[in-house]
Structures are given as structure tokens and as C-alpha cells.
């Protein structure tokens, strides 16, 4: 099993459990150059809020979009947008990525901005 298929297997298992809970989830996806975050409705069919380093407003503030500072900016932005829509509690879906580095920086920034998980 290669690295990508192992990550996808872990993500699928976690998403199955989150679906059983019926919780709104904060989904993170990372690439070497960018990081993306979305808040998805409990039914899984609707993206309620999204933020990423691809967005011009966030990308212009950063020197480089593939580091922990960029992840923290995305975490803060997604949390602020979620709170504006009345979403305060979510389940964190790390998409099979290790809870370390950029994924952890995004989660910590979202918590500091007021999102609870």
C-alpha cells in the first residue's frame, strides 16, 4: 500500500465515524504549496464555509503559502466565517493527515478564533 492510499483509507474510516455522529465537520486538505479548509454540513452535501491560501485576500498577506503561518491564517479565516454564520462547534476531520505541523497550526488558530472542537 502506498502512502496516498493509506492516507485515503484513514480518512475514509474517520469520515464514516463522523457521519454516524451527524456532526458538522471542519475538513482540512493540504498540498505542498497550499492548504484548504471547509466546514461541511452534517449531511455531507453542502459546504457551509471555506477558506484557503489560494484566495487572493489570504494569499496576499503571506510570503509563502505552504507553511505553518499560512495554515494559521486559513484556520483563523475559516473560524471567523463559520462564527459569522452561527456555527460554533465542529468535528475536526484531518483527512488522514498527521496532526502535526500545518494541520495542527490550522486547528490551533481555529480554536483561538473561537471555533470549538
Swiss-Prot record:
Protein name, UniProt field: Large ribosomal subunit protein uL18
Gene Ontology BP terms: translation
Keyword Isomerase on entry: no
Domain of life: Bacteria
InterPro entries tied to this protein: Ribosomal_uL18_bac-type, Ribosomal_uL18_bac/euk
GO molecular function: 5S rRNA binding; structural constituent of ribosome
Keywords: Ribonucleoprotein, Ribosomal protein, RNA-binding, rRNA-binding
Organism: Erwinia tasmaniensis (strain DSM 17950 / CFBP 7177 / CIP 109463 / NCPPB 4357 / Et1/99)
General function of this protein: This is one of the proteins that bind and probably mediate the attachment of the 5S RNA into the large ribosomal subunit, where it forms part of the central protuberance.
Assigned protein family: Belongs to the universal ribosomal protein uL18 family.
CDD domains in UniProt: Ribosomal_L18_L5e
Pfam families documented for this protein: Ribosomal_L18p (PF00861)
Amino acid at each position: 500500500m502506498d502512502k496516498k492510499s493509506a492516507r485515503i483509507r484513514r480518512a475514509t474510516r474517520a469520515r464514516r465515524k463522523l457521519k454516524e455522529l451527524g456532526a458538522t465537520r471542519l475538513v482540512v486538505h493540504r498540498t505542498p504549496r497550499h492548504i484548504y479548509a471547509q466546514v461541511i454540513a452534517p449531511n455531507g452535501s453542502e459546504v457551509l464555509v471555506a477558506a484557503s491560501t489560494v484566495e487572493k485576500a489570504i494569499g496576499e498577506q503571506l510570503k509563502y503559502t505552504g507553511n505553518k503561518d499560512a495554515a494559521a491564517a486559513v484556520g483563523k479565516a475559516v473560524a471567523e466565517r463559520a462564527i459569522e454564520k452561527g456555527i460554533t462547534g465542529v468535528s475536526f476531520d484531518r483527512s488522514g493527515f498527521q496532526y502535526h505541523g500545518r494541520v495542527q497550526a490550522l486547528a490551533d488558530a481555529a480554536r483561538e478564533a473561537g471555533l470549538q472542537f
